[in-house]
Amino acid sequence: MLSSRFLVLGAQFSVLSALDYHHTPVLLTETLAGLQPHPGGWYIDGTVGGGGHAAAILEATAPDGRLLGIDCDPAALAAAAARLAPYGERVTLVRGSFREIGRLAHKAGFVQVQGVLLDLGVSSYQLDTPERGFSFQASAPLDMRLDPDAPMTAANLVNDLPERDLADLIFRYSEERGSRRIARAIVEARQRRPITTTDELAEIVSRALGGRRGRIHPATRTFQALRIAVNDELTSLDAALPQIVELLVVGGRMAIITFHSLEDRIVKQFMRAEAQAGHLRLITRKPVEASSEEQRINPRSRSAKLRVAERA
């Protein structure tokens, strides 16, 4: 039986749907070493996902530590509710975006906390569920929304943006050098009929770039760019970071896990600027990366980078 806090703040998500949710938390040991959760501490996981990191934090903060978990994906919250149910009233789950982490935390009673975690990666469940449209490994609707109730999909961008704007978007959010060729190919294809599936878009991009050359699929960067744009990910990160600093007590820590250079650059520059201003102390001078063993077990951890800073 779920606690009342799940029912009140977790809103309308089904615990039964969590049975199919799978996601291996990356850099788990390193994240705990960075956050240093302790008994009785209050922590926020701004991207709670399936609850892997959150469960480890709750174990470390027993018997009376508290955790607020935030996620915009109802499937993720369902998984977190099921996984974290044994911790009862120590857990509060809220549906929302981490870009509003300050408001959501205050509303839930988490005004000053000992630590905040953001894991910015797309979960294995989201990647491996075809209808979510994040992957080109299967034919699926061109969606890519982390929040399934958000108004804009990748199909909207691909079919509606002017060619120049589409090229700029792809380059800005993926640094894809062939962005103009890709945009031209997309516009030519959509003039014949709307582009509606992931495999269709992947084939268009692959042809525009001359086919596959190496381990990485030619459409990988374009899919990344569209996902970032659909979910406004970089703007959300920019908005969240200063709010996190305000939530931390002196000595409290923020741990941010990124998965591409654009995110990591934002986090690195923010932490360095705040350290120079005397608001933060850098715990990781260089990003922490997954061990070779973790990369072998979980290949999706290869691009993960962890940065940690402490409130001064």
Curated annotation (Swiss-Prot):
Region entry Disordered, spans: 289-312
Record Pfam families: Methyltransf_5
Biological processes annotated in GO: rRNA base methylation
Residues that coordinate or bind S-adenosyl-L-methionine: 51-53, 71, 98, 119, 126
GO cellular component, one term: cytoplasm
Main location: cytoplasm
Keyword Heme: no
GO molecular function per UniProt: rRNA (cytosine-N4-)-methyltransferase activity
Listed InterPro entries: RsmH, SAM-dep_MeTrfase_MraW_recog, SAM-dependent_MTases_sf
Segment forming the signal sequence: none
Cell compartment(s), UniProt: Cytoplasm
HAMAP family with a match to the protein in the record: 16SrRNA_methyltr_H (MF_01007)
Family: Belongs to the methyltransferase superfamily. RsmH family.
Protein name: Ribosomal RNA small subunit methyltransferase H
Species whose genome carries this gene: Roseiflexus castenholzii (strain DSM 13941 / HLO8)
